[in-house]
């Protein structure tokens, strides 16, 4: 119950796709993005630098790159619509920006699910000083 309270407090004031991304990760990977991926490796969480530490961290790197390629929108604030059909996430709606961000989030959620075996607790709360290598291009 305490964990649920912490999650609720952390989500206060969070807008748009961040909440939707959390819900999508829960649906696809069956785990909380906030609790598993918000402070993992060099790229999961706010910011990102250095080289991805493993396949899970690479999911976040690719997600950051995808957000960077989204045109004319603020990825962390735009809302989007999606549905689940036959176990698949389907992005919808009339907003091109929202659709781009939804597709980025969908790819990341699938990547997290597919790379659960690579998750290593040593990368949780990974010190930024360990992320100083030259970053690779998107």
Swiss-Prot record:
Active site: 63, 105
Any further remark recorded for this protein: The subspecies C.h.atricaudatus mentioned in PubMed:20347857 is currently considered invalid. However, since different origins of specimens explain sequence variations, the specimen origins are indicated under strain in the reference section (in PubMed:20347857, Iowa also refers to C.horridus and South Carolina to C.h.atricaudatus).
S-S pairs: 42-131, 44-60, 59-111, 65-138, 66-104, 73-97, 91-102
Short name of one Pfam family: Phospholip_A2_1
EC class name: hydrolase
Catalytic reaction annotation: a 1,2-diacyl-sn-glycero-3-phosphocholine + H2O = a 1-acyl-sn-glycero-3-phosphocholine + a fatty acid + H(+)
EC number(s) on file: 3.1.1.4
Record text on cofactor binding: Binds 1 Ca(2+) ion.
Cofactor(s) needed for function: Ca(2+)
Native species: Crotalus horridus
Localization: Secreted
Distribution of this protein across tissues and organs: Expressed by the venom gland.
Protein name: Acidic phospholipase A2 CH-E6'
